[in-house]
């Protein structure tokens, strides 16, 4: 069984695309395939002048790909024995080979953008779930990725913590960060996305603006999804 079935998309610089659909539709698998965390047996990706064929990808190409595509997961994935500042600096030091002074400057700037300047010397155990996820977001943005991949970034959070993370993501979108977002929060999708793709069984069934897809879907499968969504969440 194919998890992804000839799925293809093009994203413009500064655009935010949201992937929605039922559980098992292939949304997270697609995101993880883009930066080769899942290993597709075929397909290509092109970012500016960098192009790679997944069927022949080399270790060097994987590293380049992951420099261009930063990912924020459902879970926080922070180093427990490093402070918020050290977590954000890590990729800058190891991947980008910046000096400690340069990495510290960028890390402080990114933590400030997500409202965590006063938590930069705190360890993850002393941070709330929302604060941990904002550190993860700052760490991804610090890498200055061509595209930011967000896989259900608020689904593991308590409801009262969701807003602070969504605000930080929305701020990044307003600043021109290109993003591909997987989310089940349709109000947030409507707020932040330029374009919404509805996936079913590894295929894009319908594409349009948030208003078109959420409020005026054309395809029967999309209509069924939103009828079920309204029963579940409203």
Give the positions of each predicted feature:
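Helix N-cap at the start of a conserved alpha-helix in ABC-type nucleotide-binding domains
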Residues: 159-161
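Conserved ABC ATPase signature
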Residues: 123-127, 131
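A short, proline-enriched helix->beta-strand linker immediately N-terminal to the Walker B motif
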Residues: 142-146
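A short, surface-exposed alpha-helical micro-motif characterized by mixed small hydrophobic
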Residues: 189-191
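ABC ATPase NBD coupling module
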Residues: 52-70, 174, 216-217
